Amino acid sequence: MSTHGDYIENVLSEEYTSIRVFKDDEGSKTELFQHNKTDNKLVKITSKNMNDHIFRILRGFRHTNLPTILDVCACEDHICVLEAYVEGETLESLLKKGILPHNVAIGYMLDICAALVFLHSQQIIHRDIKPSNVIITPEGKAVLIDFSAARLISSDKPVDTDNLGTVGYAAPEQYGVYQSLPPTDIYALGVMFNEMVAGIHPSVQTPDGKLGRIIRKCTDTQISSRYQTVGDLAHDLQKYKKYH
């Protein structure tokens, strides 16, 4: 019997051409397809470890700082997700050219904060914020991608059951100390922000003055000492931007 997964595969094979593989490792593959007639592009993600419920939540919304989810399919042994392709350059690639002016970095931070305010309102924690998961569009907008490590906040799971994330950006609680919560994403935001303005991990050095205090509050090892909401962080960033 034909399934929705079969339908997706048939459409891709008949109407699209694979033009690039972004990632292909154990249990996960991310591939770029281009429509044969319109040249429209989409990203196909298959994984044995992703939470399809998260993608089904996101499919019902559109947000300027998040990729549009086009379709989700739970197949026998994996999840298949189709996303609209986000044109642009990764923040990781951009930072290889050097640190960013403070006003530019804050602009990107506010874009990612806007994405996280929405995600957290849906009880979704991203858990893998880093420069390679941020796309800077030709218009200068920052878009947060890759939800393969995301999880839903759970009232009956006091600690994370899977240690996902990236070393250097992952908060201490992601290693089984506590459950991932909004301050978990804020920790990674702070690390990434310091890399944008100082070029190094905040454990080595942070900027002087108010900007450094903001970063240190993001990256405190104690979850209770960090900003508790992304909205609070965005408020301080906007205030800094206004007076500097």
Predicted regions and their residues:
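Conserved HxN/HPN-centered segment at the entrance to the catalytic loop
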Residues: 62-71
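AlphaC helix of the protein kinase catalytic domain
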Residues: 91-100
